[in-house]
């Protein structure tokens, strides 16, 4: 019986040791899992920060693209009629010269009066859209930004670099030159 008791004690002792070893292994595994979980949480946090950073970059890109598109749309609205205006200005300038031709024929004077009214309406439409004549005159200073010299004249009786005569007026669309004024310049 003593043997049996000792055997039971030993069995209990072995069982306790096995339980203790198993408990220690579980605790160790639990620590390992906690470390793995902490590492994964750090990775998740790092990924979330990277996602937020990338989102902020994309939002900035979208804002910049929107701003650029709005600026381009504004430019198109502001200067979009340039080609049409260029095509219309030359015939209108010719019509102005025809209208300025003196005549004694009353019927022709009536037509010329009607053409002057049409020219005036077209010029008003141009001005409404930011297109206007430069109003270059003889005696103005020549500026290659606005004027195109068709001819340089010596002994014109004017100072050098002054406009002697205007062949055709120039036009601006808002702050840009649409058509340069064609002029004769004193040397």
UniProtKB/Swiss-Prot annotation:
Write out the GO biological process terms.
protein folding
Is Acyltransferase among this UniProt entry's keywords? no
Q: In its keyword annotation, does this UniProt entry include rRNA-binding?
A: no
**Stretches for region Disordered:** 1-23
**Cellular location(s):** Cytoplasm
Tree of life domain: Bacteria
Which PROSITE patterns did the record assign? GRPE
Which GO terms label this protein's molecular function in UniProt?
adenyl-nucleotide exchange factor activity; protein homodimerization activity; protein-folding chaperone binding; unfolded protein binding
Q: What is its main location?
A: cytoplasm
GO cellular component terms given for this protein: cytoplasm
UniProt cross-references to SUPFAM superfamilies, sorted A to Z:
Coiled-coil domain of nucleotide exchange factor GrpE, Head domain of nucleotide exchange factor GrpE
Under the heading PANTHER family, the entry gives: GRPE PROTEIN, GRPE PROTEIN HOMOLOG, MITOCHONDRIAL
- Function recorded in the entry: Participates actively in the response to hyperosmotic and heat shock by preventing the aggregation of stress-denatured proteins, in association with DnaK and GrpE. It is the nucleotide exchange factor for DnaK and may function as a thermosensor. Unfolded proteins bind initially to DnaJ; upon interaction with the DnaJ-bound protein, DnaK hydrolyzes its bound ATP, resulting in the formation of a stable complex. GrpE releases ADP from DnaK; ATP binding to DnaK triggers the release of the substrate protein, thus completing the reaction cycle.
Q: How does it associate, per the subunit comment?
A: Homodimer.
Family to which this protein belongs: Belongs to the GrpE family.
Name listed for the protein in its UniProt record: Protein GrpE
Q: Tell me which species this is from.
A: Mesoplasma florum (strain ATCC 33453 / NBRC 100688 / NCTC 11704 / L1)
Lineage here is: Bacteria, Bacillati, Mycoplasmatota, Mollicutes, Entomoplasmatales
């Amino acid at each position: 019986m003593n043997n049996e008791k000792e055997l039971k004690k030993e069995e209990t002792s072995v069982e306790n040791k096995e339980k203790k070893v198993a408990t220690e292994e579980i605790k160790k595994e639990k620590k390992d899992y906690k470390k793995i979980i902490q590492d994964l949480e750090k990775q998740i946090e790092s990924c979330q920060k990277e996602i937020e950073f990338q989102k902020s970059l994309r939002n900035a890109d979208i804002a910049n693209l929107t701003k650029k598109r709005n600026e381009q749309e504004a430019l198109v609205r502001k200067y979009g009629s340039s080609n049409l205006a260029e095509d219309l200005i030359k015939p209108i300038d010719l019509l102005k010269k025809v209208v300025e031709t003196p005549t004694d024929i009353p019927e022709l004077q009536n037509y010329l009066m009607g053409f002057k009214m049409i020219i005036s309406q077209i010029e008003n439409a141009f001005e409404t859209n930011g297109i206007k004549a430069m109003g270059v005159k003889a005696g103005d200073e020549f500026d290659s930004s606005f004027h195109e010299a068709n001819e340089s004249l010596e002994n014109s009786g004017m100072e050098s670099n002054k406009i002697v005569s205007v062949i055709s007026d120039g036009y601006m669309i808002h702050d840009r030159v649409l058509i340069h004024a064609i002029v004769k310049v004193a040397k």
